[in-house]
């Protein structure tokens, strides 16, 4: 099978037909993903977008999960955690079908970032995981007891394996994607308690963000660069965006907690932040 046969807009049309529940489209899309998972498109994935153009890209892992669940019965837990080759190939194939030339591999990064610490999670069968909002990992009394996790097993190893496969298939430099301090705090402390402290105890919030940076994110970033010296790190901070906590709090809490890491150098500029709801 030739993936180029599904060059835009043919691939997008196939996805639309599949989403509409057309039986023939489901059969066809299964043939595409059978070939993808078998490695038949690996050569295609090595063709990267031109560097002298401006590209749009997309996070497609949720759509890839929906497809694999529909045609193979793969659950979210299996999809994200058990087979890095299947995961990467499925995501790259979805990008090609959508007509996205700039390949980009991500995962349920907010969920993974807090699961590393022991946060209770919710794993639906066909939707991405998330932290359980009814069972926050930390509170105001114990939040500074949080220690550095092991980055050589479980979720960090799963991410490392995904990055190794991505680099092998595409040649792209490995890009670690994890939560920024504020969004990590929101997922393990609770959105509402954290917002209350933003209003009434901002000093505590800043101390908490610095603790998470020092104990979790900085060691994780340093682990990443020890494994992938040519790597990059993308911090995401939707919860810390100006739309959620206001522009001034975004500056003095979210952005401040990032900029203080690595004495402000941010590993020679190889660590950056995005996902401020378009405000970056």
Regions found by a protein language model. Name each.
Residues 1-69, 73-78, 101-103, 147-280:
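Active-site loop segments of alpha/beta catalytic cores
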Residues 109-147:
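A contiguous, low-structure linker/loop signature
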Residues 88-122:
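Membrane helical hairpin/interfacial module
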Residues 84-94, 217-221:
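Short, acidic/polar
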């Amino acid at each position: 099978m030739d993936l180029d046969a599904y060059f835009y807009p043919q691939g997008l049309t196939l996805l639309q037909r599949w989403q509409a529940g057309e039986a023939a489209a489901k059969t066809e899309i299964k043939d595409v993903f059978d070939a993808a998972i078998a490695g038949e498109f690996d050569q295609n994935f090595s063709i990267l977008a031109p560097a002298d153009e401006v590209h749009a890209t997309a996070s497609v892992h949720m759509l890839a999960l929906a497809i694999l669940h529909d045609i193979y019965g793969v659950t979210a837990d299996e999809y994200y955690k058990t087979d890095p080759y299947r995961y990467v190939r499925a995501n790259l194939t979805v990008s090609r079908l959508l007509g996205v030339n700039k390949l980009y591999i991500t995962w349920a990064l907010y969920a993974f970032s807090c699961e590393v610490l022991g946060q209770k999670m919710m794993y639906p069968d066909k939707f991405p995981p998330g932290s359980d909002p009814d069972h926050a990992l930390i509170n105001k009394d114990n939040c500074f007891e949080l220690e550095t996790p092991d980055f050589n097993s479980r979720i960090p190893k799963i991410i490392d394996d995904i990055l190794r496969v991505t680099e092998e298939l595409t040649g792209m430099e490995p890009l670690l994607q994890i939560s920024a301090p504020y969004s990590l705090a929101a997922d393990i402390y609770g959105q509402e308690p954290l917002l209350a402290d933003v209003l009434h105890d901002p000093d505590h919030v800043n101390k908490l963000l610095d603790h998470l940076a020092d104990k979790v994110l900085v060691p994780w970033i340093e682990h990443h660069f020890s494994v992938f010296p040519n790597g990059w790190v993308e911090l995401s901070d939707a919860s810390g965006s100006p739309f959620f906590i206001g522009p001034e709090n975004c500056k003095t809490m979210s952005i401040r907690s990032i900029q203080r890491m690595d004495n402000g150098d941010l590993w020679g500029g190889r660590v950056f932040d995005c996902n401020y709801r378009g405000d970056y």
